[in-house]
Every structure is written in structure tokens, then in C-alpha cells.
Curated annotation (Swiss-Prot):
Its main location: membrane. InterPro entries: ATP_synth_B-like_membr_sf, ATP_synth_b/b'su_bac/chlpt, ATP_synth_F0_bsu_bac, ATP_synthase_B_chain. The chain crosses the membrane at residues 15-37. GO terms for cellular component: plasma membrane; proton-transporting ATP synthase complex. This is ATP synthase subunit b. F(1)F(0) ATP synthase produces ATP from ADP in the presence of a proton or sodium gradient. F-type ATPases consist of two structural domains, F(1) containing the extramembraneous catalytic core and F(0) containing the membrane proton channel, linked together by a central stalk and a peripheral stalk. During catalysis, ATP synthesis in the catalytic domain of F(1) is coupled via a rotary mechanism of the central stalk subunits to proton translocation. Component of the F(0) channel, it forms part of the peripheral stalk, linking F(1) to F(0). It is found in: Cell inner membrane.
Length: 167
């Protein structure tokens, strides 16, 4: 029983502990409970605000990422267009240069043909004039010399031909 008296509280002890507890509870609720609850409310509000700000920041970041992706896609399209235009311009320039070179080559070839034809005609004209002059000279020499027989004529013509070949 001695042990049981140590564990079982007495009525007076129980009464005073209850009174002290209630007074402490009243004092805490009157003076400490309000500031503690307001501090807890402020902390809860600040945490809620921080979470809202984080959600808003996340949404803003997602929006910026979407905008960034759209801008990158637009830049890629623009780059591809510029490259295609540059390739097209280069191809056009090369084709124009080929056409111009071909035209210029044809013009030079035609000018060379005309020049060659002119030179050929001039040379033929000169040869004809020379042949005519030679024929006239030969005829003149033949007519000056009276030829009596065919043998002398052949000999004279052979000499004149050799003379013409040497000149």
C-alpha cells in the first residue's frame, strides 16, 4: 500500500493542480494566446503568399519559356528563309553569269568568224589580182615575142611558170 499512495494523488493536490492549471490557462488565453495566434496567422499568411508568388513565378517562367520557344522557332524559320533566298540568289547569279559568258563567247566567235571571212575574202581578192596581173604579164611577154612553133611556146610557158613559182 505504500507504493500505491505514491502513485495515487490526494484530493487536495488534485484540486490545487486543477486550479493552477485553470488560472494558467486563463492568463495564457488572456495575454499570450492572442499574440501567439496572430503570429501563427501572420506566418501562415506569409507562407501562403510565398506559395502564391512561387506559383505565379512558375507560371511566368512557363509563359516566358513558351514565348522563347516561339521566338526560336520563328528565328529558325527566318534563318531557313534567308538561307533559301541566298541560295536562290547565288543560283540565279551563276545562271546569269553562264548566260552572259555564253553570249559573250558567241559574240566573240561571230566576230572572229566575220574577221576570218573578211581576211579570207581580202586574201582571195589579192590572189585573184596577183593571178590576173601574172596572166597579163605572161600574155604580154608571149605577145611581144613572136612564137613560130609550138615547141618554143611550151618552153616559154614552162619558164614563166617556174618564174611565178619562185616569186
Amino acid at each position: 500500500m505504500a507504493l500505491l499512495s505514491l502513485i495515487t494523488p490526494d484530493f487536495g493536490l488534485f484540486f490545487w493542480q486543477t486550479v493552477i492549471f485553470l488560472v494558467t490557462l486563463y492568463l495564457l488565453s488572456k495575454f499570450a494566446w492572442g499574440p501567439i495566434m496572430s503570429a501563427m496567422k501572420e506566418r501562415e499568411d506569409s507562407i501562403t503568399d510565398a506559395l502564391s508568388a512561387a506559383d505565379k513565378a512558375r507560371a511566368d517562367i512557363e509563359k516566358l519559356q513558351a514565348t522563347n520557344e516561339a521566338l526560336l522557332a520563328e528565328a529558325r524559320i527566318e534563318r531557313d528563309k534567308i538561307l533559301a533566298d541566298a541560295h536562290k540568289a547565288a543560283t540565279t547569279m551563276m545562271e546569269d553569269a553562264k548566260v552572259k559568258a555564253s553570249t559573250e563567247g558567241n559574240r566573240l566567235m561571230e566576230a572572229a568568224r566575220v574577221s576570218i571571212q573578211t581576211e579570207k575574202n581580202a586574201a582571195l581578192h589579192e590572189v585573184k589580182n596577183y593571178a590576173a596581173t601574172l596572166a597579163v604579164e605572161i600574155a604580154e611577154k608571149i605577145l611581144r615575142k613572136e612564137l613560130n612553133n609550138a615547141e618554143e611556146q611550151k618552153k616559154l610557158v614552162s619558164e614563166y611558170i617556174k618564174e611565178v613559182n619562185l616569186n
